[in-house]
Structure formats: structure tokens, C-alpha cells
Amino acid sequence: MDDIDSSDGAAAARAGEIGSIGVSTPWKPIQLVFKRYLPQNGSASKVHVAVKKPVVVRLTRDLVETYKICDPQFKYRGELNPKRYLTTPSVGVNNDGFDNVNYDLILAVNDDFCSSDSRQRYIVKDLLGHGTFGQVAKCWVPETNSFVAVKVIKNQLAYYQQALVEVSILTTLNKKYDPEDKNHIVRIYDYFLHQSHLCICFELLDMNLYELIKINQFRGLSLSIVKLFSKQILLGLALLKDAGIIHCDLKPENILLCASVKPTEIKIIDFGSACMEDKTVYSYIQSRYYRSPEVLLGYQYTTAIDMWSFGCIVAELFLGLPLFPGGSEFDILRRMIEILGKQPPDYVLKEAKNTNKFFKCVGSVHNLGNGGTYGGLKSAYMALTGEEFEAREKKKPEIGKEYFNHKNLEEIVKSYPYKINLPEDDVVKETQIRLALIDFLKGLMEFDPAKRWSPFQAAKHPFITGEPFTCPYNPPPETPRVHVTQNIKVDHHPGEGHWFAAGLSPHVSGRTRIPMHNSPHFQMMPYSHANSYGSIGSYGSYNDGTIQDNSYGSYGGTGNMFAYYSPVNHPGLYMQNQGGVSMLGTSPDARRRVMQYPHGNGPNGLGTSPSAGNFAPLPLGTSPSQFTPNTNNQFLAGSPGHHGPTSPVRNSCHGSPLGKMAAFSQINRRMSAGYSGGSQSQDSSLSQAQGHGMDNFYQNEGYSGQFSGSPSRRQLDSGVKNRKQTQGGTTLSTGYSTHNNANSSLRSNMYNPSSTAHHLENPDTALSVPDPGDWDPNYSDDLLLEEDSADESSLANAFSRGMQLGSTDASSYSRRFNSNASTSSSNPTTQRRYAPNQAFSQVETGSPPSNDPHARFGQHIPGSQYIPHVSQNSPSRLGQQPPQRYNHGRPNAGRTMDRNHMNAQLPPSNTNSGGQQRSPRSSSYTNGVPWGRRTNNHVPNVPSTSHGRVDYGSIA
């Protein structure tokens, strides 16, 4: 009992002790008593906390899981997702629904392209930009896990062809001139066709310089950054000059940053407007704020225009605003003269076609006493005021906003605000750098393109090198590089211009993708068809290389011709250009000049006369400067042959073939119906230049052949082959002229139909009129003096028989000389009147037959018979300022000719490699009539050619 009591007391005491402890301290169980629960497999499980996902997440990111909760059988397929289109508008209209109404490929996120050559896949992720040329998409390459920029060209032939030029130029620059990527030119990776669209793959770059200025709130960049970018741009321009390439569209939007490289670098992009320096094509190029004076004035241009644009870019980088923000070309030129204190030199103004649009002649180029003074120099020209321009153009010029308080370059640069809180020493240092910048800009923006600095000269300026600037920079002289061929310049006049220059049309979308047709601009064909230097509108003359149907009015045909001139250069046949290089046969795309004739060679003579009615009326917007008189075009009255100058090297007559007619008696002595040309050849190359190529070529323009030195020349058989066509009971005996080197004799064996039995029975006595391209450069006046009076009298009679222009049903013979002797004249000077009209004989539909007296050479041809010029627009590129080329503008639906309602017929629609129709628009096509051939004529028994000839359609 006592034990129980004692034990109870101990328990009570222990309980009281525990109770007192529990009050003062927390309870801590023994570790051995409580252990973590372990399942049978022996691994501890994590504690899961149930967190409910927001509704937004379950219905967006986890939408597929939500659907599977509702329906375990649900399967997701990405191709069924509604597409997020990147192209606007996104409604399929053309190209079997792949293209919209603008012929842009309809792009959507996650669309993929595939290159058939490289087997590379490109998945579209975003749209970087778009323009009238097409679109630029940001694409992901799964194989390399990288991004690239893919330019998708519009599904139209003009854009396609121009994009091929860009591909060719960039490939050449990357692989040949800059294989190590050190000259800041964008890299091209790949190009391929996708759904009939040409796609070009470039490296992906960052923002352009304009966006950089915009981010900086249009405040100028620091001089150190301006110097860094300028040095890199000069490296790119030096590479272009070394390659003989003109960018033609240099501006801040086309210079992109490459932020992946440190320090930051830039790269020049967008070579869609680029061309070779010796094969310039377009006259309306460059964005307006960065357009050079020679382009504004319509003067022949070189790589110097890129240096002008570069100067404008450097000024804009420093100022934050464009230096010449003109609202129109007149406004830009006015600002240039005002800010720079100079004007273009007189030799440029004298030759430029747009001079009368912006300047007035206040003196004579030979007597500058009455002229104005600009920059301390006398000038025969003075810039028009706004009122004078309005009076001439019948509209007010658009004037842009004035951003600067000062009107000259030095004050604009000096007065630009300095950076806030800039130390005094830095202000003095920057002031000296600004003086160097002013001198640098003056050298880049020199009105005289011959004096404008080259990239190599500009790279040595103290502003670029960092040397102290103490005096105006005098660049080291450079040996000018003179190109062999004469520049070809095509105006954007309403008739053809931009598109027809390269054989293109913005309306032709249904074409098999073939290389660009053979032209001086893109000599890619293995063969060529000749034309004549003597016809108006033909630009493929002696040294240009004869080309396929390269009549300026048709580009691919033989019948469509526009009488249009622009001021590429003096239109003489053999003269000295500014570089001192003879240009045998210059482009007729030159300013028309009213020539001054001696007595007897007026409008009734054979020379060109503005009253002759043989030129089409001026198109709207054409400058009258094309028709200003010229003081150095004078025909010498005397010549041994009494038919005007006997050699094209002695006169300039727009390529008239009649300047050599005085040599007929000597040529006629050596020619007959059976003349083969082999035995009389002065050079063995003549035998190679005859026969084969001419045998399958039946062209007008005098049946001229091609040079043996032409890039696309074919080896020809010896001998001149004649072929006879019988139509309506009349035998037509035709011949073919050949061209050989300058050391060879150029002759013609072209014979003309005649209604007299004398010619049929005795063809040896029939006069063979030499072709305009068959002038013999080795022929001298001494040979003419050897002729007796009997030969001269027979020459006059025979020559008169060859002065008829006739046209038979065969359009290929439409430009022949008929041998009807009824038009002979006793006055030889009257036999030069309509020489240029050879180029117009095909414009007429339904020309009279060859024996029609009204079709003779001396007959007056009304001006209404020629086609007036029609407006022609060009496409535009991304960011391009002027309404032109790739920024440009917008193909028209069609062009209507004023005479006989002549419509341009497009080539037949073809299918691409994918079998899809290339041309979705409804247009009228012709399969049987090549360009230039009249639709009411037919040429039977056309000889087959060894190389397939491309018929481009008809402008009938």
C-alpha cells in the first residue's frame, strides 16, 4: 500500500514537472518515435501542392491539354490552325491563288520555302519590309539554326529580270572581289524559285542608318561615329568602283548595321538598281534627296553619282536631317546651287537633255561675257527662278521644308549645336574636325563629275585618316579609266524608257524564265541579231555589239519605233568623247540637234530637218533641250562625190547611211549579183563574218550583220548568200551585209526588186545599195578621184534607182531600197533628206508596195504617221523615294497608241517549272507575230535557225 502510495506520489510529481515544462518550453518529440513514411518500394514521395492554373493560361498556352481533358481522343494538327498572314492584301487572285492582286506571294507565319539546289528549308517567321519590288521575310533555317533575310520578288517579268541583275552583281562582288567579306557588301547566300517567285537569300542584318537617326530623334550622330561609318562606306564604294559597278540607289535606308560584330559595322545592301559602269541603262535613278546633278539634268553618269550620294549621307549623319530635302527636282537643284555656291559646269549643261528645264541660256559658250557668274566662274547658263520655271512648265514647283537657318554649307555645319556640357578643349577639337568635314563634303559634292573625288581619293582625306586638318585637301591625281564601249542611256520617257531598255515590260508576267534577251545591257545570249547604226532609235552600233532586234523603240522587234532622243552624247558616228576615246557609232539615244546644212542641203535635201515631218511629236514632259540647235554639227558642202560628206568620220548625221553614198561607184564596180565577198576581202576575217549568221537572219535595218569582235558573235561562213522569195509573181532577190573588224572591208550585197526587165536580165548592172553598217573605213577620197565622168553619171542614175523606200508583203524586206529609176534627181544634194526615216518605214501599217512612187525615199512622210509617246511607269523598291524603278512605281494595265489604236501585245503565257500559269491577268497574246512585224504581213518559207529565236510579241 505504501508502495502504491509512494509510486502514485512519484507519478504525480513527475506529471507536475512535465506540466511545468510544457508551459515553459514547446514539445519536442523524440526522433526515434516519428519517422518519415516510406512506401513499400523504399523511395520517398514528394509532396504535391495543387495549384489551379488561370483560365487564360488553360485557354491559350495549354489549350491543347484542355481539349484533351475534355476529349482524350483529341489530336492536334498544326496545319489546321488559322494562318496569320503577313502579306496585305491576303486574298489570292493570281497565280492559282498564291498571289494577291499586286502579284505578291501571300506569306503566312510558318510557311516554308525550299531551295531545289541547296535543299535548304526556310521557314517564315516575320515580315521585315515590303515594297513594289516584293517583300522581305525573316526566315529560320532549321539545318543551321540561324535566321536569314529572304527577298521574295513579285511575280512579274520586269521585277524578275531586274532581280537577276542583282543576283549576278552580288554574286560577282562576293565571290570575285570580296571573298573574305572585308568590304562591307551584303552577302548573298542562295536564290531559288518558289511558286513562280524568285527568292533571294541574304544575311540578316539589323536596322538601317535612317532608323538609327530616327531613334536618335533626328539629331546628328557624333563625329567619331560619322567618321567610322564613312570609312566603311568608302571601302564598299572603292570595291564597287574597282568592279566598275554603280549602285544607283545609295541612301541611309540601304546601309544597314551589323550589330553582331564589335565594333559595329555597316553593310551596303539593295543592288536592285545597280548596273555596270559601261552599260548604264536608266536615266531616272537614285532617291530624290541623294540624286546627283548629272542624273537630275539627264547627263551621262558614272560611279561618281554614288560619291555624290555618299556626300549627302555623311552630311545627314552629322546633321540628322537631309541636306537637300527638296520637294521636286527643281527644288533640289535650287538648293544645291544655293548651299554649295556653284552650279554644274557648262559642258554638262550643254550636253544634258534637261538643261532647258532648269536653266536659261544667257550667253554663248564661246563668248561668256554676257553670262552669269557662279563660284567666281563665268557661265553661259543661269538657273531659272520659281516664276520662270512655272511659266515654262505651266505648274508651280513643289518646294520642300527648310530645316536650316543658313543657306551655305559652311555655316550649316559650323552653326550646328555642340553637345551639351562639352569641355572647352573638346569644343576646340571638334571645331577643327568640322572644318575637315566641310572640306570633305565639298570634295564629295562637286558639281563637275570629272573633278568629284573617287573613293580612293576621299579615303585619304584628313577627316577619314584623323590627321590634323591645316589646309584644303588636294587629292592625289588618278588615271581615269576609260571604258571601251559607250554608255547606253535610256530615258523614262512615256514611250518606253525604263522597261523596254532591258527588254522588259511590267505587264508581262507570263513568261518562261529564260536569260535576259540579248542586249548591250545584258549580253547573255550565245548569238546576236544585227541592227543598223543608221536607223533612228537603234543603239546597237559598231562598237556596242550587234544585238537581237535591238531597235530602241521595240527592243525585241523590228517594226515598232519611236523617234525619241536623249542626251547621252553627241549622236555622231565617229567622234571623240570627253575621255578622248573614239566611239564608232554612238547611241541614238542622244539629244536631237538641228543641224546646220550648207547651201542646197536644206529641208529639201537628204539631211534631217525639223520641218520634214519625220519625227513624232514631243511627248508630255519631254524637255525642249533635245531640239536646241547645235553649233558644231555642220555638213561640209564640198566632197569628191558631190553627195555630201563621203565618210561617216567626217560628219555627224544621226547615223544616216547616205553619208557614204558618194563611194557607190567604187563599191558598185566591185559588186555583182554573184559576188561572194571572199576574194575581195581586205582581211581574212571577212570570210568568217559572212554567211552562217546572216543566213538565218532576215532583219530590216539594212540587213546589217555583226562585228567579229562582238561578245556574242557567231563564227560565220564565207560568202554572201542570197535567197529569193517569190511573192505575187515578183522575184525578190535579197542579200546580207556583214560586219568585220575595222581592218576589214565592210560591204553589202543587198539587191533590190525591180519592175524593169533590165535588172532581171542583167543583175550585174543593178545597183547594190550598201548597208548602213557596211562602210569601208579603208576607202579614201583618192579612190573617188579615180572615177571618170562616165562612172559619175552612171552613179547618179544608179544611185537614184536605189533611193526608193518600198515595202512588200514580207515584212522582213520592208526596209529595202527600190531600184525604180523614176525618182532620180539632177541635184545630188536632194538625196539626203529622209535618211533617218529608214527607221520609221515599219511603223506604218499597210505600207505601199515597193514599186509605189509614193513610197520613195524623197517623198514627204507626214508626222502623224508616227506613234506618239505614251506614259511608262516603273516599279519601286522598299524605301525608294522617287516614283521609279523599284520604288517606283506601278505597272500600267496597258498603253494605247494614238495612231491606229496600236496596242502592245504581250507574249504568250507559259507555265513555270511547277506547272502553274505564269500570267494570271487576262491579256491579248499572239503566237505568230514577233515584235516589229506588221500583223497584216506574212513571211513564207522562213529559213530555220540553228539557234532558237525568241519572239517577244508584237507591237502592231
Curated annotation (Swiss-Prot):
Post-translational modification: Autophosphorylated at Ser-222.
Domain called Protein kinase: residue spans: 122-464
SMART domains per UniProt: S_TKc
Superkingdom in the source lineage: Eukaryota
Protein name per the record: Dual specificity protein kinase YAK1 homolog
Induction: Induced by drought stress.
Gene Ontology cellular-component terms listed: plasmodesma
PANTHER family the UniProt entry points to: DUAL SPECIFICITY PROTEIN KINASE, HOMEODOMAIN INTERACTING PROTEIN KINASE, ISOFORM D
Ranges where the record places region Disordered: 620-657, 672-781, 806-956
Organism of derivation: Arabidopsis thaliana (Mouse-ear cress)
Parts of the chain that traverse the membrane: none
